Amino acid sequence: MKKYIVFAIIPFLFACSSSTLNDDYDEAFAKDTQGLDILTGQFSHNIDQIWGVNELLVASRKDYVKYTDNFYTRSHISFDEGSIMIETLGDKSRLYHSIIHTLLMGADAKGIDLFTSGDVPISSRPFLVGLVVDHKGKQVKNIATASNFANYLLQNKLQTRYLTNGNPVQYVIIPMVANHVAVRAQRYLPLIRKAAGRYGIDESLILGIMQTESSFNPYAISYANAIGLMQVVPHTAGRDVFRLKGLNGQPSKKYLFNPAKNIDTGVAYLTLLRDKYLDGITNPTSKRFAMISAYNSGAGAVLRVFHNDRDIAINKINRLYPEQVYRILTTMHPSEQARNYLLKVDKAQKSYRVIKNSESDLP
């Protein structure tokens, strides 16, 4: 893991609390985000003042970042790299405290405020169980085990780096288990299978998209206001799915940080792409490639790669072999992100061989 990473401020992150009629609807989205420039500006200012301008580290799709101790201590979980870095500008006692709270934090993203510097609550069902083992190879499930592990880390694995202003930063790095991605994926497999059955979407496609979108990070957020495991954007895909379900408005952040609801919404959107926006593509493999690309860039952008007229674009796709559709979308889509997205999801999907009624087959 890199010792420090620079991220652009995420323009939405966890918005100020809004008053909505219920947890499912967030029609006050505009009001909910009016004060975010001030909020994110202050957040950035706090970090700049304490850590320095080149040390801005914030949460993203595949990175959990939480500040504590008035921003003097922070925890960073890289879900891609499978590594946890906990560092402080304070003394070892702060590091010790943060190690324990990070190891024992819960999986409920709604209960963790990434915009404050308060402690993360200790959970009786820690998220990192199964993903991290201590120096004796044991699971870290309670305060006693976490405390012993923290003491071991401080005595044997403590490292120091220096900021540009010369201030020392003490830190420890905790590796996740080698198969950490598969462990996280398996946790959500029952929910994935439920959604796959409900909407008729291949389980391996859902897994491939989730791995590419968030690396199965339940705390995932992004600069594009995408939320949760399947990175659903509330006011676009979320609103479309609510309309499909006969609901008004759009899903709230709390709604989308619920894994079951997030997965259901993401998979429902895939069915909209398949049955509505990309309807007319006859070859199932060609349609799958188009669906994957459209999940990232939108169906309109995908069709315009072939022609500005929708019907002509569909006809062109239908005259091509799936391999040709794949090549065009991965080389000629105007968005580099979309080109790479199809490559990544297709590769990830191939790595999953999900067998019905079994949960032990993930790679």
Swiss-Prot record:
It comes from Histophilus somni (strain 2336) (Haemophilus somnus). PROSITE patterns: PROKAR_LIPOPROTEIN, TRANSGLYCOSYLASE. Residues 1-15 form the signal peptide. Its main location: membrane. Its EC number is 4.2.2.n1. It is an enzyme of class 4 (lyase). This is Membrane-bound lytic murein transglycosylase C. Murein-degrading enzyme. May play a role in recycling of muropeptides during cell elongation and/or cell division. GO terms for molecular function: hydrolase activity, acting on glycosyl bonds; peptidoglycan lytic transglycosylase activity. PANTHER family: MEMBRANE-BOUND LYTIC MUREIN TRANSGLYCOSYLASE C (PTHR37423:SF2), SOLUBLE LYTIC MUREIN TRANSGLYCOSYLASE-RELATED (PTHR37423). Keywords: Cell outer membrane, Cell wall biogenesis/degradation, Lipoprotein, Lyase, Membrane, Palmitate, Signal. GO terms for cellular component: cell outer membrane. It comes from the Bacteria. It catalyses: Exolytic cleavage of the (1->4)-beta-glycosidic linkage between N-acetylmuramic acid (MurNAc) and N-acetylglucosamine (GlcNAc) residues in peptidoglycan, from either the reducing or the non-reducing ends of the peptidoglycan chains, with concomitant formation of a 1,6-anhydrobond in the MurNAc residue. NCBIfam families: PRK11671.1. It is a lipid-anchor. The keyword Ribonucleoprotein does not apply.
